[in-house]
């Protein structure tokens, strides 16, 4: 089967916008059921088959961060971005919801839950980029190594594409300002008080955020489960869409009673 025989990832989603936090915020939405607010990586929304699968059971809302569109965002830190996300959630009439974040979005989700835990039913962190011991800055990688760090299966849809230079020039200073060096003693002190159920996922072959950082996140979050995904790099959704969607959907539906136990594990093919 060729790519032309397969529907495009995200084909079930509808693009909308909402006025919130002083911005016109673009988002994509599909599905019915309990709401899942998804915070994507630093490159903005990338639609995947995993999101399509989750939308079969949940109302999935994929945000484009304020400042990732035409309007600039001078937010100073992740706490400020989390406050903007909270305003967007309110504008979308989301009182309580599941929160899912990828890489940069995972870092934002950690800050969000320390301030708005009463709004979050559960958290899913895909390759979260908050703690980055022995990790790699993408800008230091040659093109072939860059692809390998993100994807174990770059042949699978969606294919990786080169970042748009104009987008990078506009957005990347904000990303670097918020990310810093990944350390945050203040956040650690707050995370230890968070009881929200949390699923932490790392691709075993992640070449951007070293998977050892999953243990750091788990150590700070007392009600969490850490799972390593076999045959996946940084972008788990694209490398293993079925496995990602299955384990996330089960976790969102059943919490810590989901199909994998609460010990560190490995999701096999």
Language-model regions, residue ranges each:
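Short alpha-helix in the alpha/beta-hydrolase fold that links the catalytic acid
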Residues: 196, 210-219
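Acidic catalytic loop of the alpha/beta-hydrolase fold
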Residues: 205-209, 234
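Short beta-strand/loop motif that positions the catalytic acidic residue
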Residues: 194, 200-202
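Catalytic active-site module of serine/aspartate enzymes centered on a nucleophile-bearing elbow/loop
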Residues: 224-225, 230-269
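Active-site loop/oxyanion-hole signature of alpha/beta-hydrolase fold enzymes
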Residues: 61-100, 246
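Flexible "cap/lid" loop of the alpha/beta hydrolase fold
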Residues: 110-115, 121-151
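Conserved HGGG/HGGXW glycine-rich cap/lid loop of the alpha/beta-hydrolase fold
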Residues: 19-70
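Active-site nucleophile elbow and catalytic-triad environment of alpha/beta-hydrolase enzymes
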Residues: 173-190
């Amino acid at each position: 089967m060729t790519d032309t025989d397969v529907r495009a990832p995200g084909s079930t989603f509808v693009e909308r916008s909402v006025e919130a936090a002083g911005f016109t915020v673009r988002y994509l939405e599909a599905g019915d059921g309990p709401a899942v607010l998804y915070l994507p990586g630093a490159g903005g929304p990338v639609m995947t088959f995993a999101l399509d699968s989750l939308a079969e059971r949940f109302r999935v809302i994929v945000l484009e961060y304020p400042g990732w569109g035409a309007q600039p965002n001078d937010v100073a830190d992740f706490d400020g971005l989390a406050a903007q996300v909270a305003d967007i959630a309110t504008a979308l009439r989301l009182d309580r919801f599941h929160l899912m974040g990828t890489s940069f979005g995972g870092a934002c989700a950690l800050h969000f839950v320390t301030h708005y835990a009463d709004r979050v039913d559960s958290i899913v962190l895909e390759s979260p980029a908050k703690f980055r011991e022995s990790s790699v800055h993408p800008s230091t990688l040659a093109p072939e190594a860059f692809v390998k760090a993100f994807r174990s299966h770059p042949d699978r849809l969606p294919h990786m594409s080169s970042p748009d230079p104009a987008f990078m020039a506009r957005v990347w200073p904000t990303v670097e300002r918020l990310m810093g060096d990944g350390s945050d003693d203040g956040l650690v002190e707050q995370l230890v008080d968070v009881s929200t159920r949390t699923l932490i996922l790392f691709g075993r072959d992640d070449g951007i955020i070293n998977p050892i950082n999953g243990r750091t996140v788990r150590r700070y979050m007392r009600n969490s489960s850490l799972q390593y995904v076999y045959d996946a790099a940084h972008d788990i959704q694209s490398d293993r869409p079925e496995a990602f969607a299955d384990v996330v959907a089960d976790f969102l539906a059943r919490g810590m009673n989901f199909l994998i136990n609460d010990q560190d594990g490995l999701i096999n093919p």
